[in-house]
């Protein structure tokens, strides 16, 4: 259960003199969601940045087949050590998937969303996908259902999606130009025929646009995922953003290409690089004036379980969950959710109190800070235990989430690993400080030598970040 909000417990907050300049960026956006839309996504950790601090999700791997071959994808069905889309430890039948959901719904009552995202395409496996949704809708009606698709077969199944009360659909749409698509997709299999090059990309785009419009007409929320590929579609994504907004998508998730050679993808094996953090943020910021941007995506496995950034899938492998009795308890789950919502109200009040009276000043430099958090909107994790840092932009009057950055945790077997520490420093090198619940003297001193200050606290993220900024900016 998320802890209640308490008063400040900052144990160290004595930043050194401010340096000139800042991060030179702006994540602000004029796009806001209306109240009705916010209510629909309030407990969806993938669709709501605020909800992902409190609620968990899970994916079930019932859809192995795919009808397109993306150059950034290599599906794996028995892989436990890679964290990326298209990868699972094992495939499940719809009945096994439903059993797993009921087990986890009891073990992790803050799990509110069940998604099918692969490892292939859910709509290339319609019987397994919809059978799974039917079973879960019948046995766990409080769990939101969603799916992620390339969109090729979407127009044919929107009515079925609506019938099953699947309220959230994600389309992966990387381009609106078939010539660019020819560089991203090796082939597209449609109506028993395989198409290559721009012809295949054109067919895919037509169906994606049809599907997007059909979702809008059916009042089904649509998020669009786009993989940013430097030199191919990076300069084109602003056009994609404008088009999908016009067609009815409400959220755009621009993700970095994952292209490590060991993953075996075409792009990985041919040396296509992914974008830097700076390049990714630049494109996201360019698009943020048109529609709401998703910046908290973890590019999850197709069998992910738990809070975003906290994958617990290996706790629930088939050999384990099949031996567990379902513990789904609707009333208990509602009680947990009520507690979370009560805490969210307290957290909102605490944030408003922190931000009250903070006047926006254009001359204030913007800086980045890295946060070690286990969720709940708090600075509440030990530096050595963090497997990722959430990065926020601070300007003295606002604190805005920018991104998350994965790292290997520093403390392993009770000792700090030097190689791991060096990688952490590199990962957060553009941050003025790291905000943690606790940190040892040795890593604290090493961070300071690298130009990164530390703040030890257990409190609301915005409060700790603004307190640091005020002292940093005093000089």
UniProtKB/Swiss-Prot annotation:
Cofactors, names only: [4Fe-4S] cluster
Name any Gene Ontology BP term.
nitrogen fixation
Q: How is the cofactor bound?
A: Binds 3 [4Fe-4S] clusters per monomer. One cluster is coordinated with 3 cysteines and an exchangeable S-adenosyl-L-methionine. The two others probably act as substrate.
Enzyme class label: lyase
Chain positions recorded as S-adenosyl-L-methionine binding sites: 72, 120, 172
What positions does the domain Radical SAM core occupy?
52-303
Which pathway, per its entry? Answer: Cofactor biosynthesis; Fe-Mo cofactor biosynthesis
Which Enzyme Commission number(s) are on file for it? 4.-.-.-
Q: Where is the signal peptide?
A: none
Q: Where is the composition biased (Polar residues)?
A: 1-17
Q: Look up the coiled coil feature and give its residue ranges.
A: none
CDD domains per record: NifB, Radical_SAM
GO molecular function per UniProt? 4 iron, 4 sulfur cluster binding; lyase activity; metal ion binding
| Entry binding sites for [4Fe-4S] cluster 2 | 297, 300
Q: Which domain of life is it from?
A: Bacteria
Q: Where does [4Fe-4S] cluster 1 bind?
A: 66, 70, 73
Q: Which PANTHER family match?
A: FEMO COFACTOR BIOSYNTHESIS PROTEIN NIFB, FEMO COFACTOR BIOSYNTHESIS PROTEIN NIFB-RELATED
This molecule's function is given as:
Involved in the biosynthesis of the iron-molybdenum cofactor (FeMo-co or M-cluster) found in the dinitrogenase enzyme of the nitrogenase complex in nitrogen-fixing microorganisms. NifB catalyzes the crucial step of radical SAM-dependent carbide insertion that occurs concomitant with the insertion of a 9th sulfur and the rearrangement/coupling of two [4Fe-4S] clusters into a [8Fe-9S-C] cluster, the precursor to the M-cluster.
Q: Which NCBIfam families match?
A: nifB
Q: What name does UniProt use for this protein?
A: FeMo cofactor biosynthesis protein NifB
């Amino acid at each position: 259960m998320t802890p209640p909000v308490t008063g400040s417990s900052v144990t160290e907050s004595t930043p050194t003199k401010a340096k000139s300049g800042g991060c030179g960026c702006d994540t602000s956006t004029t796009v806001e969601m209306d109240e009705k839309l916010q209510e629909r996504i309030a407990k969806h950790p993938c669709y709501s940045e605020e909800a992902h601090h409190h609620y968990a999700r899970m994916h079930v791997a019932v859809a192995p087949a795919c009808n397109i071959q993306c150059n950034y994808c290599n599906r794996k069905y028995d892989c436990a050590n890679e964290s990326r889309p298209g990868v699972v430890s094992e495939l499940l039948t719809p009945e096994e998937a439903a059993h797993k959901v009921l087990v986890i719904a009891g073990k992790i009552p803050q799990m509110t969303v069940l998604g099918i995202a692969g490892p292939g395409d859910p709509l290339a496996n319609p019987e397994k996908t919809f059978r799974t949704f039917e079973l879960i809708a019948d046995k766990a009606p409080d769990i939101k259902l969603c799916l992620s698709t390339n969109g090729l077969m979407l127009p044919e199944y929107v009515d079925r999606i609506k019938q099953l009360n699947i309220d959230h659909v994600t389309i992966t749409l990387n381009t609106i130009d078939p010539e660019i698509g020819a560089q991203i997709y090796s082939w597209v299999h449609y109506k028993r025929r395989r198409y290559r090059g721009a012809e295949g990309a054109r067919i895919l785009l037509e169906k994606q646009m049809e599907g997007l419009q059909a979702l809008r007409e059916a009042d089904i929320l649509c998020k669009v995922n786009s993989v940013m590929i430097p030199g191919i579609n990076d300069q084109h994504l602003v056009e994609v953003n404008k088009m999908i907004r016009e067609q009815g998508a409400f959220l755009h998730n621009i993700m970095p290409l994952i292209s490590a050679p060991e993953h075996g993808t075409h792009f990985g094996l041919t040396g296509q690089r992914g974008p830097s953090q700076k390049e990714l943020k630049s494109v996201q910021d360019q698009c943020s004036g048109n529609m709401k941007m998703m910046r908290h995506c973890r590019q999850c496995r197709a069998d992910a379980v738990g809070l975003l950034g906290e994958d617990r899938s290996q706790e629930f492998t088939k050999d384990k969950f099949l031996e567990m009795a379902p513990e789904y308890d609707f009333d208990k789950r509602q009680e947990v959710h009520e507690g979370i919502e009560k805490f969210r109200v307290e957290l909102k009040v605490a944030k408003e109190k922190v931000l009250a009276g903070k006047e926006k000043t254009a001359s204030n430099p913007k800086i980045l800070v890295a946060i070690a958090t286990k969720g709940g909107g708090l600075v509440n994790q030990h530096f050595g235990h963090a497997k990722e840092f959430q990065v926020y932009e601070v300007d003295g009057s606002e604190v805005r989430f920018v991104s998350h950055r994965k790292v290997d945790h520093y403390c392993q077997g009770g000792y700090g690993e030097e190689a791991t520490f060096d990688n952490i420093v590199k990962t957060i090198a553009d941050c003025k400080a790291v905000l943690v619940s606790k940190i040892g003297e040795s890593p604290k001193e090493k961070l300071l030598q690298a130009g990164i200050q530390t703040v030890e606290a257990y409190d609301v993220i915005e409060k700790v970040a603004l307190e640091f900024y005020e002292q940093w900016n005093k000089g």
